[in-house]
């Protein structure tokens, strides 16, 4: 469940997202259910830039083998079924979903999360 960055081990339960989910750090959650929360990104890359954060502690896609697969599938299935609703709460009816994985993938918080980017024309390649 943890990842090495240099000699440092990162446990998702020690991340800012774990603290936001637990309420230890205040946040402006605009969506909250049994499986996830949604917040606005503090460094938006589009007019609408949302983070959908599962409540299940998974560091990233490479850590899926280390968690209860049935709980993971239930959680992620639910989240994917709610993405359009969550995006629409902030006025995005067209959007791009992004999951960053690992250091080279620019994952800045070692807790699996989904970016919803919208509110403008998305270009390809994304860069």
Swiss-Prot record:
It comes from Dictyostelium discoideum (Social amoeba). InterPro entries: Histidine_triad_CS, Histidine_triad_HIT, HIT-like, HIT-like_sf. GO terms for biological process: response to bacterium. PANTHER family: HISTIDINE TRIAD HIT PROTEIN (PTHR23089). This is Protein pkiA. GO terms for cellular component: cytoplasm; extracellular matrix; phagocytic vesicle. Pfam families: HIT. One of its GO terms (molecular function) is hydrolase activity. Signal peptide: none annotated. Residues 16-127 form the HIT domain. PROSITE patterns: HIT_1, HIT_2. Coiled coil: none annotated.
């Amino acid at each position: 469940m943890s990842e090495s960055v240099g000699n440092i081990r990162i446990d998702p339960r020690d991340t800012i997202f774990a603290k936001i989910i637990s309420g230890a750090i205040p946040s402006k959650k605009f969506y909250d259910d049994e499986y996830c929360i949604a917040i606005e990104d503090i460094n938006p890359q589009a007019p609408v830039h949302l983070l959908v954060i599962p409540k299940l502690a998974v560091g990233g896609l490479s850590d899926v083998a280390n968690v209860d697969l049935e709980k993971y599938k239930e959680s992620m299935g639910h989240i994917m079924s709610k993405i359009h609703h969550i995006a629409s709460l902030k006025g995005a009816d067209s959007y791009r979903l992004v999951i960053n994985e690992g250091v080279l993938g620019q994952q800045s918080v070692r807790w699996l999360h989904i970016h919803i980017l919208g509110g403008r024309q998305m270009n390809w390649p994304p860069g």
